[in-house]
Amino acid sequence: MVSQMVTIINPTGLHLRPAGLLCKEALRFQSSIKFEYGNTTANAKSVLSVLGACVKCGDEIELICEGADEKEALETITELINGGLGE
């Protein structure tokens, strides 16, 4: 298992478009990919789970990957989030 703290920089947080992009990228990996925000744990491979976490701009999440390709998954998803998730 690998994890990293990441700050959401999207002005409108994780709304539908960036949540969809995050999930699409997460689904490429075999590893379990989730994030923790406050008391919430969200499955990064589920748009509804990501949206349900209600993550806003400036919020810090802990991205957690576990599985065969966990390091690559963590690096890729972290880069995507740090790049603004297409916004």
Q: In which residue ranges do the predicted regions lie?
A:
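A composition-driven signal for long, intrinsically disordered, charge-rich low-complexity tracts
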Residues: M1, Q30, L85-E87
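Intrinsic-disorder/low-complexity, polar/charged segments enriched in Ser/Thr/Lys/Arg/Asp/Glu/Gln
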Residues: M1-M5, E60-E62
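Compact, glycine-rich, soluble single-domain proteins
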Residues: T7-C57
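C-terminal structural segments of small proteins and small subunits
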Residues: G52-E87
